[in-house]
Amino acid sequence: MDARDIILRPVITEKSADLMDSKKYTFDVALTATKLQVRDAIEEIFDVKVKSVNIMNVRGKEKRVGRYTGKIARRRKAIVALTEDSNDIKIFKDENNE
């Protein structure tokens, strides 16, 4: 699998933004991705050194619109911790460099 097929998108929430201060970044990853694949993909895409990877499966939820029900797809979330000497990952565009 290609590195860009493993890392789908960053997860942007208040909790993940707080974790960024301690060099921990949250990403949605492919459902079949392992910790080693996530580590290698992050190191390849962002040119950083990964300290640890924690992965969790988020179950799909049922949602309703009126009398119709549907299901939100399940997903797999990875929290990646970088080493202290590693550079930060730039998820947001700098306002000064536009």
Curated annotation (Swiss-Prot):
GO MF, one annotated term: rRNA binding
Alphabetical keyword list: Ribonucleoprotein, Ribosomal protein, RNA-binding, rRNA-binding
Keyword RNA-binding assigned: yes
InterPro entries associated with the record: Nucleotide-bd_a/b_plait_sf, Ribosomal_uL23-like, Ribosomal_uL23/eL15/eS24_sf
GO annotation, cellular component aspect: ribonucleoprotein complex; ribosome
GO biological process, one term: translation
Residue intervals passing through the bilayer: none
Family: Belongs to the universal ribosomal protein uL23 family.
Quaternary structure, from the entry: Part of the 50S ribosomal subunit. Contacts protein L29, and trigger factor when it is bound to the ribosome.
Function: One of the early assembly proteins it binds 23S rRNA. One of the proteins that surrounds the polypeptide exit tunnel on the outside of the ribosome. Forms the main docking site for trigger factor binding to the ribosome.
Protein name in the entry: Large ribosomal subunit protein uL23
The species this protein was found in: Lactobacillus delbrueckii subsp. bulgaricus (strain ATCC 11842 / DSM 20081 / BCRC 10696 / JCM 1002 / NBRC 13953 / NCIMB 11778 / NCTC 12712 / WDCM 00102 / Lb 14)
